[in-house]
Structures are given as structure tokens and as C-alpha cells.
Amino acid sequence: EALFTPWKIGNVEIKNRIVMCPMGGTSLFGWFELTGCGFDKEAAKLFLERAQNNVGLIIPGIAPLRDTFWGKWLWQNPKMFEELKEFMDEIHKTGAKLFIQLTAGMGRSWAITELVGPLHKNKITRAIVKPIIDTSHELASPSEQPARWAPDIICPEMTKEQIHEIIEAFAKTAKLC
């Protein structure tokens, strides 16, 4: 019975205590796509189905502020947020709530693949692929330190400019969400 009682997070009332927790691969924004970030209609179908089956709160997987490929900021994709708005209208019709999890990025926790490691270690290849995937930006951390999953790769310290860009991106993206 307690599962079906409403509760609040701040001033947001959740209709019941059934929560779909975040899982890898469940972001609404396809942020690891070679074609660039976009609204993930397949993930949206999954969430809408859960909302229609009485889940009170849905928390999708992370939404990095910046595309892994091509380096475009989320807030620079108005079409994606138009699709998100339409989707949120459908979610709200069920009485459910959905919270978007914005993240600055991965930093030292970024999963280094067998392909990315050598690209990053070699200054020439790193420079060549930078327009497609800026490994130094993806690995940027609060201080210079080893990558979590590839300790032989040293993550660069974030610059003040990067910090200001991330703060601005949080504000602009949150406003659109």
C-alpha cells in the first residue's frame, strides 16, 4: 500500500513510490552516435511504456552536456528539445514525472577503448581526429591524473575556459529541459 502513496522531491509531487532508476544505455539523448546527438525515440518508447504501467518517477541514464563525437553542445540542438517537449507532454498525461540527468562529462572515468587509447597517446593522431572526437576534452579532469580504466593515460587538467563553458552549458541546457 505504501508503494502507491504520493511523495515529494522539493515541490514536485510524485504520484507513487515506484521509481525507474537510471541505467546505462537509457539516455533520451543519443550522445555517443557518430551522426551526432539526437532524441532517442526507442528509449522514449521504453519510458512511455513504463509510465503507462504506473511508474511514478523515471530517471533516464546520463545526458552529457557535449556530444562525444563532433563536440556539439546539447543546447545547440533545438530540434532535440522540441522532440523532448512533445515526449514530456505524453509522459505527463500518465501522471508520471521524468528527471533528466545532465552531466559535465566523463573525465577520468571515460571508458577508454582499444581504439581511443592509441589515438589519445599519439599527439599527431590526436590532432587529426580532434574535430571528430576530442579525447583531451573527453578526458579533462579537475587535476592531471591517470584515467580510471586506462591508468597509463594521463587525463589533462581542465582549463578555466573549459570550466566556464561547462557552467554555461549546464545553464543553457537545463533551461531547455
Regions found by a protein language model. Give the residues of each.
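N-terminal capping/small domains of soluble enzymes
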Residues: 1-114, 155, 166, 174
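Non-globular sequence segments
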Residues: 92, 97, 103-176
